[in-house]
């Protein structure tokens, strides 16, 4: 029989930073990112941009462990996963502030800065990056236009 103390200890170790909507270990999310990065390399892509919104947050929740607070603002959201390196979480302004205490991702930015972010990535690579896009069907035109060349 498992002791109560052992159960509590296991629960506290789920997320070593004490963050997260799902209470899954940060290592679970890092493993998901690593798998995507391996696929990006295999398909010769520089990155994947995953888009969700406040009504269908599943894509970004899967990678970021953040569930948006949709009663305070519209919450377009995205996760930028580069072939190598750390991921970036994009949220609406109020949700971006809230996510700092919840998501395991440390680089959290306003979704309104997508265009500048991608321009900087293009500059760093010396060319337009080759990025996959997930969630395109639910992405508002104003955001998809910011990702156009």
Give residue ranges: language-model regions.
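Non-catalytic accessory segments adjacent to catalytic cores
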Residues: 113-149
């Amino acid at each position: 029989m498992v002791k109560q103390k052992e159960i509590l200890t296991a629960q506290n170790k789920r997320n070593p930073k004490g963050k997260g909507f799902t209470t899954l270990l940060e290592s679970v999310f890092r493993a998901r990112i690593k798998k995507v990065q391996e696929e990006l390399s295999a398909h010769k892509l520089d990155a994947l941009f995953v888009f969700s919104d406040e009504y269908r947050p599943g894509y970004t929740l899967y990678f970021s462990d953040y569930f948006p607070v949709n009663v305070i603002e519209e919450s377009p959201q995205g996760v930028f996963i580069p072939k190598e390196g750390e991921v970036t979480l994009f949220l609406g302004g109020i949700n971006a502030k809230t996510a700092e205490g919840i998501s395991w991702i440390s680089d959290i930015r306003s979704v309104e800065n997508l265009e500048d972010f991608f321009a900087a990535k293009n500059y760093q690579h010396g060319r337009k990056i080759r990025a996959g896009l997930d969630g395109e069907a639910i992405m508002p035109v104003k955001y998809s236009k910011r990702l156009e060349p």
